[in-house]
Curated annotation (Swiss-Prot):
Gene Ontology cellular-component annotations: cytoplasm
Name of the protein in question: tRNA N6-adenosine threonylcarbamoyltransferase
Cofactor note (record): Binds 1 Fe(2+) ion per subunit.
Function: Required for the formation of a threonylcarbamoyl group on adenosine at position 37 (t(6)A37) in tRNAs that read codons beginning with adenine. Is involved in the transfer of the threonylcarbamoyl moiety of threonylcarbamoyl-AMP (TC-AMP) to the N6 group of A37, together with TsaE and TsaB. TsaD likely plays a direct catalytic role in this reaction.
Family, as annotated: Belongs to the KAE1 / TsaD family.
EC number of the protein: 2.3.1.234
Main localization (coarse): cytoplasm
Chain sites annotated for binding Fe cation: 111, 115, 301
Domain of life from the UniProt record: Bacteria
Gene that encodes the chain: tsaD
Cofactor(s) required, per the database record: Fe(2+)
Classification via Pfam families: TsaD (PF00814)
Length: 333
């Protein structure tokens, strides 16, 4: 079955064509980063307007790169939530109209489940069950992934997501938006042990996260060290990144041991962080666990993961109807 995937939950307009569950024929992403950079973050209304401009060309490009005609598409999968309502509605409305015009089935995909499915697009996907950390700009959660359709939420952030914390620290340091890659690059020049930022493990027997305290500690340090901030910036970035990584690694390993899993995985935009990946490889080896990461091109938001998850939903008959709608908050479909 050939599935067209569409993703528009935040500031990336993406389309992909996937066949046979995990064979990616094409994947196109149109980023709005250059536009939102000047505002220091995503402007929802602006994001929606840019999705409207990009959606048709992006879908056309994905179909063309897949080497197929639109008539060969047998189903449509589209992100239904969570995300920015206006942004979601652009992709969702396009998918609904496309499927209705072609008289083909369509499915709404939970964005978080899509990120978990990005792990299945690898040449060496994890076998079930596995324990997955999903870390991005909007979400930080741990799931026990029992099967293709069973995702048990073990813990989640109580405040800021890990990626969101990176963005906010980048803003404190005057590095602009988005912050993940620039903080990582700056941290590579610093000493992660020089500034002992706090690690918030909350209840060590639980799997929830909290990064607001760490964010506040960085803000206080920046405020108190304005005079030599320039020379300290690499060390601030390194200390912050190390603190986030320590918490993510501890919680993921702890959750895997609690569920009896020997396979762990990281998905979402933060999985592209090489410092985190390197640390998790060490921790996995230390605990005799296998670590899985998505292909680099599928770490961030993309439509291939949406198409892969949608393929499964359509195969099971779990379809959307004309009165189906999007949702902004995290939930499972």
């Amino acid at each position: 079955m050939i599935i067209l995937g569409i993703e528009s939950s935040c500031d990336d307009t993406a389309a992909a064509v996937v066949s046979d569950h995990n064979t990616v024929l094409s994947s196109v992403v149109s980023s709005q980063v250059d536009v939102h950079h000047r505002y220091g973050g995503v402007v929802p209304e602006l994001a929606s307007r840019m999705h409207i401009e990009a959606i048709s060309p992006v879908v056309a490009q994905a179909v063309d790169q897949a080497g197929i005609s639109p008539d060969q598409i047998e189903g449509v999968a589209v992100t239904r939530g969570p995300g920015l309502i206006g942004a979601l509605l652009v992709g969702f409305s396009f998918a609904k109209a496309f499927a209705w015009a072609k008289n083909i089935p369509w499915a709404g995909v939970n964005h978080l489940e899509g990120h978990i499915y990005s792990l299945l697009l690898s040449d060496d996907p994890p076998a079930f069950p596995f324990t997955a950390l999903l870390a991005s700009g909007g979400h930080t959660s741990i799931f026990h992934v029992v099967s293709q359709d069973r995702f048990e939420l073990l813990g989640q952030t109580r405040d800021d997501a890990a990626g969101e914390a990176f963005d906010k620290v980048a803003k404190m340091l005057g590095l602009g938006y988005p912050g993940g890659a620039v903080v990582e690059a700056l941290a590579a020049k610093g000493d992660p042990c020089l500034i002992p930022f706090p690690r918030s493990f909350l209840d060590k027997d639980g799997f929830d996260f909290s990064f607001s305290g760490l964010k506040s500690a960085v803000a206080r340090y920046v405020q108190l060290n304005r005079e030599n901030l320039g020379e300290m910036m690499p060390h601030i970035a390194a200390g912050f990144q190390s603190a986030v990584t320590d918490v993510l690694a501890f919680k993921l390993i702890h959750a895997a041991r609690a569920t009896g899993c020997s396979r762990i995985a990281i998905a979402g935009g933060v999985s592209a962080n090489r410092f985190l990946a390197s640390r998790m490889k060490i921790e996995a080896a230390k605990h005799n666990m296998a670590l899985y990461l998505p292909p680099p091109s599928f770490c961030g938001d993309n439509a291939a993961m949406i198409a892969a998850r949608g393929h499964r939903l359509i195969s099971q008959g779990d379809l959307c109807q004309l009165d189906s709608d999007v949702f902004s908050r995290t939930r499972f479909l």
